[in-house]
């Protein structure tokens, strides 16, 4: 599939620690480095980082998460890369809604930890079908 060169690769990470401790900073820096490395290794163009620190995965009002949704809905994103799926959402229904948004806007989801690329994985097909029945 040919990607539009003007579209971004959204690199999203979230740290739920509310403190500004050294551990939180290390976790954030580590996630960002892994996302950047993954994007580079997979030839994903125009990386843009979206990060939420100190927010629960059940909270869909996270500032960077809302910005991510806005650029997805504006068809400015070709790929979303996360370290693991729980960084996006911890709630089943919120995760399903996000996957439907990604599918509607032809965005490829990459999860490094789960080794997932795309929405054609069996787990996603089942999840996307769940709300239709």
Residues covered by each model-derived region:
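Short, structured surface patches at the beginning of a domain
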Residues: 1-133
């Amino acid at each position: 599939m040919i990607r539009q060169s003007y579209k971004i690769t959204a690199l999203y990470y979230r740290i739920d620690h509310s403190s500004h401790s050294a551990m939180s900073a290390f976790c954030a820096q580590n996630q960002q480095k892994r996302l950047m490395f993954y994007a580079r290794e997979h030839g994903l163009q125009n990386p843009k980082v979206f990060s939420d620190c100190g927010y629960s995965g059940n909270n869909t009002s996270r500032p960077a998460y809302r910005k991510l949704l806005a650029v997805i809905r504006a068809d400015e994103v070709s790929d979303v890369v996360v370290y693991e799926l729980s960084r996006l959402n911890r709630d089943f229904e919120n995760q399903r809604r996000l996957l439907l948004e990604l599918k509607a806007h032809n965005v490829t989801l990459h999860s490094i930890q789960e080794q997932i690329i795309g929405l054609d994985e069996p787990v996603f097909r089942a999840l996307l079908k769940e709300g239709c029945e």
